[in-house]
């Protein structure tokens, strides 16, 4: 049986379809609650303590961890398009708000929600391209490729946030991620 992605429109070339999902997974993974590459700029601009900013990251991680058991339930309940659009819109809205919200409980809630959308979008993209990566569902091939996507985006987001901070404002990274989504 040949690998196919029926959820993608016919005008998209078949060779490009799985790569679109890998790029979308990278985009979801680049999104974050706060960016450590711009940590000092965030602390200086918002007058928050380092622990407050790190708590944003912990809330993002908690959102991903608590939503993980729900991923397959969501995948089997909703369509691919619905899940990707919802996750993308959530990442877009939360990234636009996170840069400007100063009340910490609301900021932590937004970071938690952004973590849920981040893991949902990444899971949807990577589970759709899994059979393309390894037609026999060999997890010894799939998980290293998944880790390459995750680690690449982690390094990329720190570099990009430091660069955007150098260009002018640490919020540029949030605007960039919102624009990508």
Question: Where do the PLM segments sit?
Answer:
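Extracytoplasmic
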Residues: 16-58, 66-71, 122
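Helix-loop-helix hairpin linking two adjacent transmembrane segments in secondary transporters
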Residues: 142-181
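Short hydrophobic/small-residue motifs within alpha-helical transmembrane segments
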Residues: 60-62, 151-152
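Residue-level signature of the transmembrane alpha-helical cores
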Residues: 24, 84-90, 94, 110, ...
């Amino acid at each position: 049986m040949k690998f196919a992605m029926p959820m993608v429109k016919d005008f998209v070339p078949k060779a490009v379809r799985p790569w679109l999902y890998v790029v979308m997974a990278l985009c979801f993974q680049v999104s974050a609650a706060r960016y450590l590459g711009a940590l000092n700029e965030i602390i200086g601009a918002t007058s928050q303590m380092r622990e407050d900013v790190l708590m944003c990251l912990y809330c993002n991680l908690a959102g991903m961890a608590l939503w993980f058991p729900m991923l397959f339930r969501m995948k089997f309940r909703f369509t691919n398009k619905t899940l990707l659009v919802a996750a993308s819109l959530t990442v877009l809205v939360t990234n636009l708000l996170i840069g400007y919200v100063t009340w910490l409980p609301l900021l932590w809630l937004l970071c938690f929600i952004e973590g849920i959308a981040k893991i949902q979008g990444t899971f949807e993209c990577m589970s759709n391209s899994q059979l393309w990566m390894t037609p026999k569902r060999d997890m010894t091939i799939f998980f290293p490729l998944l880790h390459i996507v995750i680690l690449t985006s982690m390094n990329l987001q720190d570099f990009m946030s430091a660069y955007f901070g150098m260009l002018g404002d640490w919020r540029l990274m949030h605007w960039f991620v919102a624009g990508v989504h």
